Regions:
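Active-site activation/catalytic loop segments of kinase-like enzymes and analogous catalytic loops
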Residues: 327-330, 335-404, 426-438
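Conserved ATP-binding subdomain of kinase catalytic cores across diverse folds
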Residues: 52-268, 318, 333-377
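All-alpha amphipathic helical-bundle segments outside canonical DNA-binding/catalytic cores
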Residues: 234-236, 409-424
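Short Lys/Arg-enriched alpha/beta "domain-start" segment
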Residues: 2-46
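Conserved catalytic-loop position in the HRD/HxD motif
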Residues: 307, 312
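Pre-DFG segment of protein kinase catalytic domains
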Residues: 303, 321-324
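Long, amphipathic alpha-helical stalk/connector segments used for oligomerization, subunit docking
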Residues: 273, 286, 372-382, 414-422
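An alpha-helical support segment within catalytic cores of ATP-dependent transferases
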Residues: 126-131, 269-304
Length: 438
């Protein structure tokens, strides 16, 4: 950021006209992509020329209210023919004038030729523009596949300093955890992470999609879940093995801290009381929290994933991969966390809280699929849903607890593991209810 906060273009201070034009372009982009930013002032922090001429690239970072947004802009001659990557929105955002004259400005990630130039800036690799396609678009990032060889993710919303989720991925790569798409290059400027290039996971299937297919097969066929055509048990076991290896890798990368089970029990109560106070009077919940407070064995915390549900993983022919590290070890829930944060603000949390997140998500998949198939509830799919959930919970635990070394990180007794996971799941349920009641 320059002292005046107006950004720079090609090593020179932006003119007032350029600054206003870029601010208007950023505002237009936000309105189209999110429907937000009506009237919120835009302050251009950086305007970095990555490629001169036409097509050109100007990479813009701007402050919009409390957010820091990132928009790579492509520049082309007015009236020139452009072939945009298929998408729902018009990528043209306005006009911009630089040393090469007036240009049409557009979202660079919608133009395959410009994307290849942007990739060259980040990693100095050439790709065929005809083999560029968008594979993921969220409010926080856009991911493009290039020749089914590389995956290029550009972050739309930035944080000051290193990006927590990216930090987890890079740390796991450093310690040899190979259940991730290997990082090739990180795009970073002025202390901010702008994007990452990784290997492309060919043939990857979303974990959630596989789980939904499995439970739908069960609802269609009936009977024991292990006999259904899409039985998920073996995959749940492999997923548990992968999760344990991830936790051991995070332990190696960041170390561990002691946990306080009494504080965790208090956190569960505080989460449940505002949304479902009657749950705290149930005998099983009373006993659960008493058991949690009474635990005397060491309960370690690590830099955990933070929101490790079935939608954060994918399956390829080579096995399971963690494909999404959001929120980067900064969970929305507090049970299972250490009382002290790391120097960078990162939260240490029981690895079993990640396990609870994953197991909770399996139950949610079963319930959602049942509601989709039988909205009236007449088929009585609840029993099948619970049978599917039980089988895959058991398989996941078998895979997780069977990994060498994990008993030194989580409590060795299965009863203690049960108490911790059940308590963390209860908080997760409360967090979901709070979100639904907003």
């Amino acid at each position: 950021m320059t002292p005046s906060g107006t950004g720079r273009l090609g090593g020179r201070q932006l003119t007032e006209t350029q600054r206003l034009a870029l601010a208007e372009i950023v505002s237009s982009h936000l309105m189209r992509s999110t429907g937000e930013n009506d009237g919120v002032p835009v302050q251009v922090l950086e305007a970095e020329v990555l490629s001169r001429g036409r097509p050109g690239i100007v990479d813009v970072v701007a402050r919009v209210g409390e957010r820091t947004v990132h928009l790579p802009l492509g520049l082309r001659e007015p009236g020139g023919e452009t072939k945009f990557i298929a998408g729902d929105e018009d990528p043209v955002l306005g006009v911009f004038e630089d040393d090469d004259g007036l240009a049409v400005a557009f979202d660079a990630l919608h133009d395959a030729e410009v994307v290849t130039a942007l990739l060259w800036h980040v990693v100095a690799q050439e790709v065929d523009p005809g083999r560029v396609r968008q594979i993921r678009h969220t409010s926080e990032s856009v991911t493009l596949a290039l020749e089914d060889r590389l995956a290029f993710t550009v972050f739309s919303e930035l944080v000051d300093g290193p990006r927590p989720g990216l930090g987890l991925l890079l740390a796991l790569d450093e310690v040899g955890f190979n259940h991730i798409a290997a990082p090739v290059a990180v795009w970073r400027r002025s202390g901010r992470d702008l994007g990452i290039v990784q290997e492309f996971l060919a043939g990857a299937s979303s974990g959630r999609a596989l789980a939904v297919t499995s439970v739908r097969d069960l609802y269609a066929s009936g009977g024991p879940p292990e006999l259904a055509g899409g039985d998920f048990g073996a995959e749940a076991h492999r997923l548990g093995t992968m999760a344990a290896r991830m936790h051991l890798g995070l332990d190696e990368a960041f170390g561990r801290r002691p946990g306080d089970t009494k504080a965790w029990a208090d956190a569960v109560e505080e989460a449940v009381r505002p949304v479902a106070p009657m749950l705290l009077d149930r005998p099983d919940v009373v006993v659960l929290l008493e058991e949690l407070r009474a635990l005397t064995i060491p309960c370690h915390t690590i830099r955990s994933h933070g929101d490790f549900h079935i939608g954060r993983v994918a399956r390829t022919e080579q096995g399971w991969y963690v494909t999404d590290f959001s929120p980067g070890g900064k969970p929305a829930t507090t049970a299972g966390t250490s009382s002290t944060a790391a120097d960078d603000g990162a939260v240490f949390r029981s690895p079993l809280a990640d396990v609870a997140d994953l197991l909770w998500s399996l139950g949610a998949v079963a319930d959602e699929a049942a509601a989709e198939r039988d909205p009236s509830g007449r088929e009585g799919l609840g029993e099948l849903a619970r049978a599917w959930e039980r089988r895959n919970r058991q398989a996941f635990f078998a895979g997780y607890l069977g990994v060498a070394g994990i008993s030194g990180l989580v409590p060795p007794g299965r009863e203690a593991v049960r108490v911790l996971v059940t308590a963390f799941e209860l908080e997760r349920v409360a967090a979901r209810m709070a979100w639904q009641q907003r």
